[in-house]
Regions:
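N-terminal Rossmann-like NAD(P)+-binding domain of SDR-like oxidoreductases, especially those catalyzing
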Residues: 1-171, 214
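Short, conserved catalytic or interaction motifs in soluble domains
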Residues: 35, 174, 237
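Residue-level signature of the cytosolic catalytic core of signaling kinases
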Residues: 41, 53, 177-181, 239, ...
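Conserved donor sugar-nucleotide recognition element shared by glycan-biosynthetic enzymes
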Residues: 140, 148, 181, 243, ...
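Hydrophobic alpha-helix immediately C-terminal to the catalytic Tyr-X-X-X-Lys motif of short-chain
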Residues: 147, 151, 155, 188, ...
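C-terminal substrate-binding subdomain of Rossmann-fold SDR/epimerase-dehydratase oxidoreductases
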Residues: 190-309
Length: 309
């Protein structure tokens, strides 16, 4: 099958591309390279350097002729969404609308969308949180990603297409940007290996559900291989880990005895987040297979190799 991946030069998108290629699919990538890297795109893949809001998008999709579109491209920083909600909405909402309109004109019948899990549900006492829990996003990022979900549902209803939203937990692994604010594991790994202090926002007892990048790529690949599966499915491990515990594990792996520093909590960030992925197992046969300890070891090893390069 021909698959078009938006954001395929980025952290999550590049892992998705690798998995789709391994499964034998022909892959095209759209990426504006704002945060993605050209060198992450394999030679067997056609890279179209294009923003989803660009007028050239019609021609790019027409050239790719995809049977399925996997929409990963996004503005993913919560803090930037708080500082500049208009930009966040422009990328995550208007960019998605533009893509869906082009898909409609090109006759694309299948879209798989990677949305957010924790930022969608906000603070909740129902943990792990299932898909039918009310959406209570506490940040513009959560609002924009869940709004895009609604447009995807509308596109499917109007065109007869099949749309599947995967609400991702906190994704981590090789290739994550340690200079960004969305990946605490990448940030801690990079700084610990460099001998720099690490800053924990708030008291560090906030929890997250950390899911390894290859597990996420596997979920997307299963979605591509299951064209009749529609709706929404959480992609997470079902396990909560505090930021303090995360730091302790990474400090042990890197041989660092220094304690983390603490700063103020970030606006728009929820206290606890962990996803119920029962539906993903039922619909896609998917469960996370990489444990946190294994994933952290692989991630630290990758950052060590990057430092040597």
């Amino acid at each position: 099958m021909r698959v078009l991946v938006t954001g395929g030069a980025g952290f999550i998108g590049s892992h998705v591309v690798d998995r789709l290629l391994a499964d034998g699919h022909a892959v095209d990538v759209i990426d504006n390279l704002a945060t993605g890297r050209r060198e992450r795109v394999p030679g067997a893949v056609r890279l179209h350097v294009c923003d989803l809001r660009d007028a050239r998008l019609d021609a790019v999709v027409a050239a790719a002729q995809p049977g399925t579109v996997v929409h990963v491209a996004a503005q993913a920083a919560v803090s930037r969404s708080v500082a500049d909600p208009r930009f966040d909405a422009s990328v995550n909402v208007l960019g998605t609308i533009a893509l869906l309109e082009v898909c409609r004109r090109a006759g694309v019948r299948r879209v798989v969308y990677t949305s957010t899990g924790g930022a969608a549900y906000g603070d909740t006492d129902v943990l792990p949180t299932p898909e039918d829990h009310p959406l209570r996003p506490a940040s513009p990022y959560g609002v924009s990603k869940t709004t895009a979900e609604r447009y995807l549902e509308c596109w499917a209803g109007l065109t007869g297409g099949r749309a599947l939203t995967l609400r991702l937990a906190n994704v981590y692994g090789p290739r994550q940007d340690p200079a960004g604010e969305a990946g605490v594991i990448a940030i801690f790994s990079s700084r610990l290996l460099a001998g720099d202090p690490c800053l924990v926002n708030g008291d560090g007892e906030q929890t997250r559900d950390y899911v390894y990048a290859s597990d996420v790529a596997n979920a997307v690949a299963r979605a591509v291989a299951s064209p009749d599966v529609a709706g929404v499915a959480n992609i997470g491990t079902g396990a909560e880990t505090t930021v303090n515990e995360l730091y302790r594990r990474l400090a042990r792996l890197t041989g660092v005895s220094r304690a983390a520093e603490h700063g103020p909590a970030r606006p728009g960030e929820q206290r606890r987040s962990v996803l119920d992925a029962t539906r993903a197992k039922a619909l896609l046969g998917w469960t996370a297979t990489v444990s946190l300890d294994e994933g952290l070891m692989k991630t630290v090893t990758w950052f060590q190799e990057e430092l040597r390069a």
